[in-house]
Regions:
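RNase H-like, metal-dependent nuclease domains and their acidic two-metal-ion catalytic environment used
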Residues: 1-59, 81-129
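Conserved beta-strand -> loop -> alpha-helix junction used to position metal-binding or nucleic-acid-contacting
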Residues: 53-75
Length: 129
């Protein structure tokens, strides 16, 4: 797996969708993945308004962040995942997150969902957005 970019941030829904779509085309991605726990169907509806042709996978978190992150952490430990470039905020979250971390690790969450979504798809390239 290759992490080619980190486009995470605090955006309005419209800006988030536009950024995700731009990344989808820029990196020739297979699909956009988003956690639906907070946005539900709204994310897909906003995406379809902007571009009905972009493939989308919604994921609903059923386990805690630590349990979701453990398999991805193992992939990095086995040297099966690589960052192409330096992603300061993402790397800081990856190195500092504990069960007691107060601030939600948005960038780490995106990375975990990205790699988890690709594990069974056969694709090894993903852009975080």
């Amino acid at each position: 797996y290759y992490i080619l970019g980190d486009y995470s941030g605090i955006f309005s829904p419209d800006t988030w969708i536009k950024t995700a779509i731009e990344c989808y085309y820029k990196w020739e991605a297979d699909f956009i993945v988003a956690e639906t726990n907070q946005g539900g169907d709204l994310i897909e509806k906003l995406l379809r308004v902007q571009d009905a042709n972009v493939p989308y996978k919604g994921v609903h978190a059923k386990r805690g962040k630590i349990l979701r992150a453990e398999p991805v952490s193992s992939i990095f430990e086995q040297d099966k995942a690589h960052m192409v470039g330096y992603f300061k905020e993402l790397e800081e979250q990856m190195c500092s997150f504990t069960p007691y971390t107060v601030k939600s690790p948005d960038r780490l969450d995106a990375c975990v969902y990205a790699i988890s979504s690709l594990q069974n798809s056969g694709n090894a390239i993903f852009r975080i957005s």
